């Protein structure tokens, strides 16, 4: 299957962005591997530390998953699409760059250098682990139990990695292997609709699972 033609404004923005923002030394594959391996190491270490988990402690997984889905939704609907003081970098990278690099008419990468426009910068995972997952985990360790703390960290980082992997796959070509699975077709369609400039500020803010979009009535109905 031939890739659809890229609209000229998108092609022009991509060329300008690559020249200005992507170093010739950048490796999209190494970027993807860093995100994946770092996340998996943290998840693996956290799981290794679990012992004798009670039913109450297992509830941490569900609660953390729902919490992460809400944070994903609010972060995307809020500062990623509306400029907020001190968080303007998120708005610039997401709305002014990501949504111009990829539109509903041109969703796919043209090469591995384009991974930079989808994956969070490597420093983000260090920020997320060091300034969110670990501090909250330490707090839970002292307020609840060791298992709750490690279950929170494993689930939170697992959710982050799921976000990165799914978002990465949405921007593969439609005829790629992941894109052929029915559930991926549905999630990809929702994200493609979100990349329509006429819809992006109002619909389909969940990148992973559209739980909050259903709850808050922001899932786009075709």
Regions found by a protein language model. Give the residues of each.
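N-terminal signal-anchor transmembrane alpha helix
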Residues: 59-75
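Cytosolic-side membrane-entry/anchor segment at the start of a transmembrane helix
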Residues: 1-42, 119
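Membrane-embedded catalytic scaffold of the fatty acid hydroxylase/desaturase
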Residues: 70-153, 157-222
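Hydrophobic alpha-helical transmembrane segments of polytopic
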Residues: 34-38, 61, 65, 156, ...
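Helix-coil boundary and interhelical linker segments in multi-pass alpha-helical membrane proteins
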Residues: 43-59, 138-151
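Membrane-water interface of alpha-helical transmembrane segments
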Residues: 18-28, 32, 51-54, 146, ...
């Amino acid at each position: 299957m031939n890739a659809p033609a890229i609209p000229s404004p998108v092609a022009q923005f991509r060329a300008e962005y690559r020249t200005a923002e992507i170093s010739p030394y950048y490796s999209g594959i190494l970027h993807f591997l860093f995100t994946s391996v770092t996340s998996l190491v943290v998840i693996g270490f956290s799981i290794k530390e679990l012992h004798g988990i009670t039913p109450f402690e297992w509830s941490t997984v569900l609660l953390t998953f729902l919490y992460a889905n809400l944070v994903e939704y609010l972060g995307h609907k809020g500062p990623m699409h509306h400029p907020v003081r001190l968080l303007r970098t998120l708005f610039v990278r997401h709305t002014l760059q990501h949504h111009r690099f990829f539109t509903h008419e041109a969703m796919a990468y043209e090469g591995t250098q384009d991974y930079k426009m989808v994956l969070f910068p490597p420093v983000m995972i260090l920020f997320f682990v060091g300034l969110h997952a670990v501090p909250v985990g330490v707090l839970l360790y002292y307020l609840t139990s060791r298992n709750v703390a490690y279950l929170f960290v494993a689930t939170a980082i697992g959710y982050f990695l799921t976000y990165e992997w799914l978002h990465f796959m949405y921007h593969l070509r439609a005829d790629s292997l992941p894109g052929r699975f029915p559930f991926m077709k549905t999630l990809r369609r929702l994200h493609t609709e979100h990349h329509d400039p006429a819809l992006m500020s109002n619909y389909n803010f969940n990148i992973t699972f559209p739980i909050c979009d259903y709850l808050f009535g922001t899932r786009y109905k075709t």
